[in-house]
A protein has these predicted regions:
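Alpha/beta-hydrolase superfamily serine-hydrolase fold, recognizing
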Residues: 16, 20-21, 25, 55-64, ...
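A glycine/proline-hinged amphipathic helix-loop "lid/cap" segment
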Residues: 1-69
């Protein structure tokens, strides 16, 4: 059963969706309009007091480093934003990135990877790996943690896969919230009990077409479902047990455990897709934030 705060948040979100003040990934909207709506809302989010935003650049990508007061020097976090792979940028990531920085006291990078439908697979994957390598070079010897939600969770997993496959230093840990790992249709997302009001199965298919049209959807970098998850770094996963993408998290957990890889995980009842990024907003997301901090501390 969800907390009272979670129920209130869900009611507010659903009311805003009905009135057209908040978007939903159901396949009914113009993707560019949807992007503009979401990014405008994200850019109005409150940022963490005491966090300084330092601009950076990785090739053609705008990037930003959220630096907290009394910043630690022993680790780096990379936050890869979600948004269905069609929206989000370094600036719109400030709300959650600065909260992560404030809570962990670790500097947090965010960056503007290329988005669909203008730039399809593998543009976002290539950009994330480019940014990851640039950050490793800037901070030699420091443990680097990848955190992302939804599409950003997918990209955090794939970035670790590319590091593994290319002999690049691996992340110290990967923290995917509500990841998507299949764009091929192999996983059944229409299970009984699916109560997801944010990302519907139809909306997911629509996003997949925008991102992967004309691509090999069984390429493991497009669908990590087709990777056996061997030699991956430790992971911490969190998701809503009734969301459309719940099965994706379940598959990751199963494969990591089969390979003997550390995998901390928890599913939550009656929440919503990618609720983890509400941070201090609900008891459920606050628990995930504390678990994230503990996971990072254990792997520095």
């Amino acid at each position: 059963m969800a907390s009272e705060q979670m129920e209130q948040l869900k009611m507010a979100m659903q009311m805003m969706m009905k009135k057209g003040f908040a978007p939903t990934f159901d396949g009914s909207a113009d993707p560019i309009q949807l992007r503009n709506t979401i990014q405008a809302a994200q850019e109005r989010m409150v940022t963490e007091p005491g966090v300084t935003f330092v601009p950076d650049q990785f090739g053609d990508m705008d990037a930003e480093l959220s630096v907290p007061e009394n910043s630690r020097e022993d680790a780096i976090i990379i936050y890869i934003h979600g948004g269905g792979l069609i929206c989000g940028n370094a600036f719109s990531s400030r709300g959650y990135a600065s909260m992560l920085a404030g809570e962990t006291k670790i500097p947090v990078y965010a960056f503007s990877y290329r988005l669909a439908p203008e730039d399809k697979f593998p543009a976002a994957v290539d950009d994330c790996f480019t940014a990851y390598q640039a950050i490793l070079k800037k901070h030699p010897g420091k443990p680097v943690f990848l955190i992302g939600e939804s599409g950003g969770a997918y990209l955090s997993i794939v970035t670790a896969m590319k590091a593994r496959d290319n002999g690049v230093t691996m992340p110290a840990g990967v923290i995917p919230y509500s990841p998507v790992i299949d764009v091929s249709g192999a996983l059944n997302r229409e299970r009984e009990g699916n109560k997801d009001f944010t990302v519907t199965p139809d909306g997911l298919r629509w996003l997949q077409e925008l991102y992967c049209v004309d691509a090999d959807v069984k390429n493991p970098y497009a669908s990590p479902y087709y990777d056996d998850m061997h030699d991956m770094p430790p992971m911490l996963l969190a998701w809503d047990e009734s969301e459309t993408l719940a099965v994706d998290s379940e598959v990751i957990v199963e494969r990591l455990e089969k390979n003997g890889i550390e995998c901390r995980h928890k599913s939550y009842p009656d929440c919503f897709h990618a609720f983890a990024t509400t941070g201090r907003g609900t008891p459920e997301s606050m628990e995930i934030l504390k678990d994230t901090m503990a996971f990072i501390e254990d792997h520095i």
